Amino acid sequence: MAAPYRQPEEAVDDSEFIDDHHDHLRDTVHHRLRANSAIMQFQKILVANRGEIPIRIFRTAHELSLQTVAIFSHEDRLSMHRQKADEAYMIGHRGQYTPVGAYLAADEIVKIALEHGVHLIHPGYGFLSENADFARKVEKAGMVFVGPTPDTIDSLGDKVSARQLAIRCNVPVVPGTEGPVERYEEVKAFTDTYGFPIIIKAAFGGGGRGMRVVRNQADLRDSFERATSEARSAFGNGTVFVERFLDKPKHIEVQLLGDNHGNVVHLFERDCSVQRRHQKVVEVAPAKDLPTDVRDRILSDAVKLAKSVNYRNAGTAEFLVDQQNRHYFIEINPRIQVEHTITEEITGIDIVAAQIQIAAGATLEQLGLTQDRISTRGFAIQCRITTEDPSKGFSPDTGKIEVYRSAGGNGVRLDGGNGFAGAIITPHYDSMLVKCTCRGSTYEIARRKVVRALVEFRIRGVKTNIPFLTSLLSHPTFVDGNCWTTFIDDTPELFALVGSQNRAQKLLAYLGDVAVNGSSIKGQMGEPKFKGEIIKPKLLDAQGKPLDVSQPCTKGWKQIIDQEGPVAFAKAVRANKGCLIMDTTWRDAHQSLLATRVRTIDLLNIAHETSHALSNAYSLECWGGATFDVAMRFLYEDPWDRLRKMRKAVPNIPFQMLLRGANGVAYSSLPDNAIYHFCKNAKKCGVDIFRVFDALNDIDQLEVGIKAVHAAEGVVEATVCYSGDMLNPKKKYNLEYYLALVDKIVALKPHVLGIKDMAGVLKPQAARLLVGSIRERYPDLPIHVHTHDSAGTGVASMIACAQAGADAVDAATDSMSGMTSQPSIGAILASLEGTEHDPGLNSAHVRALDSYWAQLRLLYSPFEANLTGPDPEVYEHEIPGGQLTNLIFQASQLGLGQQWAETKKAYEVANDLLGDIVKVTPTSKVVGDLAQFIVSNKLSAQDVVDRAAELDFPGSVLEFLEGLMGQPFGGFPEPLRSRALRNRRKLDKRPGLYLEPLDLAAIKNQIREQFGSATEYDVASYAMYPKVFEDYKKFVQKYGDLSVLPTRYFLAKPEIGEEFHVELEKGKVLILKLLAIGPLSEQTGQREVFYEVNGEVRQVSIDDKKASIDNTARPKADVGDSSQVGAPMSGVVVEIRVHDGLEVKKGDPLAVLSAMKMEMVISAPHSGKVSGLLVKEGDSVDGQDLVCKITKA
């Protein structure tokens, strides 16, 4: 029993929700409209359809003073067309009909109409619009069917009958079967006579369903079965007919109108050639560049055919025009068409109004629609915006529309259906959201309007075809107006899509996740201590006036590198009278104190001031080392993007990076070509000075990096890693060792010599001796010294280096200095100021910069290691500064936090066991991993040696012993090495000699296939960290570029009602406000998070990771696993063609999906054996749900 739609909790008629004022207003409007619509004698119209076409009809009906009635299925109860009518009634009761079946329930629809006093029924298009039995039932019930007579529908709705009619009228047709065919053998007989290609068409209905082009015998049977199945599913009749397929024809259709007195007029033609799967995608009216004589013949034939059957109401005669401009009749569609809008725009005629008034008895002459009065003006183009994913074969997308903003403006018409924020797009119906029609005085003006309108749309939450439509309308062939019916299939470059960035919604997804689940940044402990605005410092000149820092400083040591080259730079540094400073705040300082977590946005925020305050600095250490992988791994930033932005903001100070020799910035050796490629791109992107080191001081490993930097034309700072205590005669690494190493390095022609004291164990007297000895031996070689202040002697050591002849020493801004970081820049400047070693920096400016970092450190307080002071014990355990804080964190994560003192002692033991090696990344990690292994397993040094053959050592330890990190000075420890390696190989040369060169071109293609685009910088990142890079790219695909998000909101959620700003790019700012966090849904385990974005409320659904729910979702296919076959779209499985264990070949059908009245075959991506079949017939699946696996033979 049909009944008005009711809210579940209240059995109240909809009209009770409309107050008296609105009733009065509606009646007044109806009265005034009726006064201008004398032709209309009826009062109420029902539209037997859904989506946009009922809304279109309701609007005209209201203009004609008709009351309107909508019908809807249970699944459509929230659809917009229900709300646009005066009354709305559900078809049957819940579960009585399928979603599509409800709109095919002719008896039920007629019953609803009778019960509610309907006088006219408009069928729209699709569903029952071409069903003669439905038209008869309407008329038999005493109502008026807005369309042709039932007999006309019978004669023309059947394409075979229409074809026979054309032949009788001497209108040309394409060769085809004389009547409908029901058996495969009949189709086979036709192809035996006429050959291929052919087209199989459903005899009833349209929209491309039940239609297949077949080009060879192998596909014939399957295509016939699919076409008949689709036709039966969509139209209730599986009858098809067959025609010879024309290659590259145009599809031209003529809009017709006929009255009840035998009068027929045409409203000119439309070019509907741009199609996909025989469904129209873009339509143009009138056809551009159609020869006049051809147009006239087509129009004449269309009218002739309509008159021959006394055609009544609106209809469309369709023709194909081949490349010789010969036209062939296809069919007459006895209904209104989706694309009727463009005809309305060029003729000024409301076709729906004409339909209704003709049905009410009006003649064409009464409506002013005689042929001599009908003309066209300008051009109109229509696009159908759908929820389809062009990158996945236009598979329909489903889900919730999170954002919906329409286009508009001069010449833009929108006919919408369920396009609105909050709409749920289901797999049950057609995927169209809105029709966008644009008109202009010329074809080109109309085309440009459509492109502009498409760009103006903002639709989020579901994929749309807008990027494809934009590509299509911008293609030269479309611009020229020369498209044909298979143009989309024949033009693969249309799919080189530039998708919408969807930045705001992706950002909301991240912010929503932080709001629900808190920060997921690894290593973060709690929320920041400081959440206020960071005050930027002012730099004052000698007169106390603020310097203009709106632009960066452009004078510094980098200009010598750029203008004169690395050699001239090295000479200038050596000739400089003072001792220059390298500021490590932008890299090693925050690596040592804040787990390398400082983000790009916070560096850029102080960049201009830095370029002025440190304009005479030797360099800024700001890239490479751990910052490279941490940027991707934990901060979700592109390290190359960081480098580019920093370089632009600081153009005057040389940038220095840390290069791990033959490792690049990775933790193990890579093929040589990967190192050369990396250095070339790093130099191109902004690095000036490459501090090249090897973790074992292996000169062969070091040589790879040095030569790579030379090839990139960068400044080579070849580095000696300092370890131990050279003043202690019992220690392994003495002055002779270091001088011999320097000799080997100098032979490789570096521009600068670096000394890298990773643990801060270079005592002042040792510094004076080492630097002084090198200076004496190499008086023209610039020397740069790096240290950590772990023991508290860093300032003294750096001053000793300066006095012994070093040209540059390292320091960090005061508030980021000391302990495991570098010594204080303020202390060094104060100590050297006014001496012959004066660094030439303005102490007041340096202090001003520090005021910024003092605030910023509080913002990053969740990453503090909570060290309280210097640790002279470093002279014993020799743990590098950068590793010390990480080791503390790792120990706590492994449950060893209470045994920190024991861990430090174990570090000494591990170092001795490994042969007292040089300890810097990655060898320091080897020692650290072995130390934690010893503590967690409660092992002694002797236990490790004795049980080495049975212990499962950490991977890094085995890699070191194997020789993958190079050759240590003094050799590997025996018998530990042999016992631990067991049957693993032992390398006696540098690892790179055993590695095949990377196929960089193949990597680039792989990245492009996986992520849509690829740069050389992407290739370099992948070469260093394949898995980290892929995870980062996937994260960005989900959440977008988070580098623009202020750190306060990156690490913690805002307060409810707090407003904050995010600058996406110059001049584009999002104004955001967290409004509410919804309750937990027990069904989904999600919470709705509500944000206000530029004054507009948006919501995102977030998984609550703390919730415990029964997850009934199907597993998803892993796109990176070629054996896994995923559903290409959401839908219902209508047929299974395989079973577990079956051998299949590439392209064999596995299953058939039906969605949005379309069937799609899931084919085998490669040959192999089927396993793990997870679906059965009748199952509903979502896009990318795992269907089965196919294991390659």
From Swiss-Prot:
Subcellular location: Cytoplasm
Annotated substrate binding sites: 587-591, 660, 921
Keywords assigned: ATP-binding, Biotin, Cytoplasm, Gluconeogenesis, Ligase, Metal-binding, Multifunctional enzyme, Nucleotide-binding, Pyruvate, Zinc
Functional summary from the UniProt entry: Pyruvate carboxylase catalyzes a 2-step reaction, involving the ATP-dependent carboxylation of the covalently attached biotin in the first step and the transfer of the carboxyl group to pyruvate in the second.
PROSITE patterns: ATP_GRASP (PS50975), BC (PS50979), BIOTIN (PS00188), BIOTINYL_LIPOYL (PS50968), CPSASE_1 (PS00866), CPSASE_2 (PS00867), PYR_CT (PS50991)
Gene3D superfamilies (alphabetical): 2.40.50.100, Aldolase class I, ATP-grasp fold, B domain, pyruvate carboxylase f1077a mutant domain
Source organism phylogeny: Eukaryota, Fungi, Dikarya, Ascomycota, Pezizomycotina
Ranges for domain ATP-grasp: 163-360
Name of the featured protein: Pyruvate carboxylase
Pathway it works in: Carbohydrate biosynthesis; gluconeogenesis
Listed cofactors: biotin; Zn(2+)
Record-linked InterPro entries: Aldolase_TIM, ATP-grasp, BC-like_N, Biotin_BS, Biotin_carboxylation_dom, Biotin_COase_C, Biotin_lipoyl, Carboxylase_cons_dom
Chain residues that bind ATP: 159, 243, 278
Source species of the chain: Aspergillus terreus
Record-listed N6-biotinyllysine modification sites: 1157
Recorded GO CC terms: cytoplasm
